[in-house]
Amino acid sequence: MIYLDNSATSFPKPEMVYTYMCDFYRNHGVSPGRSGFDAAIETEEVVFGTRKLLTEFFNGDDPNRLTFSYNASDSLNMIIQGLAEPGDHVITTCLEHNSVLRPLHHLELSGMIEVTYLPFDARGYIDPDDVRKAIRKNTKMAVINHCSNVIGTIQPIREIGAICREAGVFLVLDSTQSAGAIPIDIKALNVDVIVFTGHKCLMGPTGIGGSYVCDHVPVRYTRFGGTGVRSAQKTHLEEFPYRLECGTLNLLGVAGLKAGVRWVLDQGIETLHRGEMRLWNKLTQGLRDIDNITLYCADSDKNHNPVLSLNVRGLDSGDVGIMLDVDHSIACRTGLQCAPKVHEVIGTDKIHGTVRLSIGPFNTDADIDAAIAAMEEIASIRR
């Protein structure tokens, strides 16, 4: 199989991720922070070590403000619902994933908040000045996608963050597609909350994600339960990480995430991104010359991730995906990619979305050559 669905989940994982997860679960797979025996202490060291590693990765200050969840969707739900209050105004964009759109829409339908959805330009970018113009006196937060999972554009977060910071608006950054793909410094970007997932560019397993919440952000807890400490207290704990965590963590996921981040750092984020974008350029250039293929991407690889959406004239994207799989053993994603507003803007919502090819660190030139040849064959059906 040629795997070109890395924007959904990176695959395969680095060998050290498999090895570390297996060793961890065989030798340290017990609950942390609940007991004083050696294995429990060692497990807690892995958990805190991963908090510390990711805090440094994003240039945060306090590892306890780094909390774990199931994935980015889970954390976005907690952050959005934990910050929003009746009468608030929230800014977001038409580039967002349903992990942002649906929690906001739920609160909007209830009458609790108002939401402004900012458009993106023909190249796929948000204009920071549109953010400035959208801010009201009651704007609580802006929830913005760092990188589109459909068209791959990386947004000008530093400029957007500066505008939000000046206006006293919290910037919540969805780094699902960017964490591990490009360097992220939340201080330099003026980010107040960053949400991430482990199973994409951080090269970890599924079922693990989280957020880093800066200490000036008054997010409330929205879940209640066991924390392993101060069990006699009737109310949920206010301090981090317990404020956003309850119950036993996905310890195997935490361990795998730790190994994945280590691998990314060992390889070098810029080195990985440069290699993937070289293949993206090759793929894009190869497909531009084929009749009946429409590409949905920026005209330059600057501020771009290795994600390419396309369509074949006269063919449903799902049918193209089936042909790629059955006839060419190429795995990709088709449809709306859980980002319906993107497709409304680029005009693909009425034709069942796009075919998305997304490149990862283990793809090769041979993979790209095969993808170009396969698309040329499929496109010839409509010549």
For each feature predicted by the language model, list its residue ranges:
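Pyridoxal 5′-phosphate
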Residues: 1-383
